[in-house]
Amino acid sequence: MAKIVVTGGQALHGEVHISGAKNAVLPILCATLLADAPVEISNVPHLHDVITTVKLLSELGAEVTIDEGTLAKGRSILVDPRSVTHQIAPYELVKTMRASILVLGPLLARYGTAEVSLPGGCAIGSRPVDQHIKGLQALGADISVENGYIKATSNGRLKGGRYVFDMVSVTGTENVLMAAVLAEGTTVLENAAMEPEVTDLADCLIALGAQIEGAGTPRITVQGVERLGGGHHAVLPDRIETGTFLVAAAMTGGSVTVRRARPDTLDAVLDKLTEAGATITTTADSVTLDMHGKRPRAVNLTTAPYPAFPTDMQAQFMALNCVADGVGVINETIFENRFMHVNELLRLGADIQVEGHTAIVRGAERLSGAPVMATDLRASASLILAGLVADGDTTIDRIYHLDRGYENIEEKLGALGATIRRIA
């Protein structure tokens, strides 16, 4: 099984280009099932989860063509959903990726029936699917859970309705939003997720002919249409990848510019980096961070739904606090079991104390390289970041987690001056 070896001690300098957002491209690919003509998606990142989604669309009968493109143009995927023949998403594909549940709403709305295996994917605690189920039931769906499958049917078109999410759910919002697009009448979603990836999905649906207002706010209003046509959409840049590279620069005392970024989606992260002592300069599509060779200051943070601090950046900032000056307190309010990287960071010499959903991190002058194991996607990134500043070699096992969400991370870090390589 492949591993990554990081040799610490190099400050990062230079420029890096950000890929399309993992958490936007997956629902957008699923949304192509709603159309009755080919849909082209561009700025698609090379990620394992994208490959899994393409396999799932193909399994349903869609014709999928991948254009690898160029470094400047990026990768694009053309989905022709007119050849879809069945509406069952099997366990073999769904078990590896939680986002597979995002075909439920589109299949139900387009074909009146859908069967989707209960999802697998990340091992970071409870991610309930009840928000998806109750939201679709509010649109008139008949849903049962039998033998590990969510089985959904509708008598004719779904009917517009009002649904208040019990809790903010990004994928729940996306699933119900996609279904509502082809429902009869008006749908109002309250307490909807406001993440930029939800807005990007809505922008894609609008480009195909949907009528949606309020995406990016807690209330989304959808006027159902009879059909969606074909079209094109470019996926927005990945704000979590952007944040990860900025934290890497901050931890190493370096100076890095990230291009093809969207700093307007990163306010909470940029605020914390400024608090840590970084000088940050932004344009519409770039962020420059300069630490002037200084050690970062410890920061306190609490994860919460957008526009607050993202849970997907928690592990990276924990790594930063491990080598920062002072004590940082991290509160994780979104997912349980999202401190699984703590034990691995301790192996590198970090000083972390966990009390329930809170981690208290006392910054150390230095970390020492050691063999560690990735437990989930963002944890694997935090271990690479810690390895960048640890003495000697840090060998990270089970990096298949990393390939689910970061495109060519070792090449990108290497271009900034990191000593990093992948070994068999």
Swiss-Prot record:
GO MF term (any one): UDP-N-acetylglucosamine 1-carboxyvinyltransferase activity
Q: Which GO terms describe its biological process?
A: cell division; cell wall organization; peptidoglycan biosynthetic process; regulation of cell shape; UDP-N-acetylgalactosamine biosynthetic process
Give the EC class as a word.
transferase
Ligand binding (phosphoenolpyruvate): K22, N23
The subcellular location is: Cytoplasm
Q: Which UniProt keywords apply?
A: Cell cycle, Cell division, Cell shape, Cell wall biogenesis/degradation, Cytoplasm, Peptidoglycan synthesis, Pyruvate, Transferase
So where's the catalytic machinery, residue-wise?
A: C122
Q: Which domain of life is it from?
A: Bacteria
Residues found modified as 2-(S-cysteinyl)pyruvic acid O-phosphothioketal: C122
The UniProt entry's GO CC annotations, sorted and at most eight, read: cytoplasm
HAMAP family on file: MurA
Question: What role does this protein play?
Answer: Cell wall formation. Adds enolpyruvyl to UDP-N-acetylglucosamine.
In terms of NCBIfam families, this protein maps to: murA, PRK09369.1
| Family, similarity comment | Belongs to the EPSP synthase family. MurA subfamily.
Q: What is this protein called?
A: UDP-N-acetylglucosamine 1-carboxyvinyltransferase
- Species, as recorded: Xanthomonas campestris pv. campestris (strain ATCC 33913 / DSM 3586 / NCPPB 528 / LMG 568 / P 25)
Organism taxonomic ancestry: Bacteria, Pseudomonadati, Pseudomonadota, Gammaproteobacteria, Lysobacterales
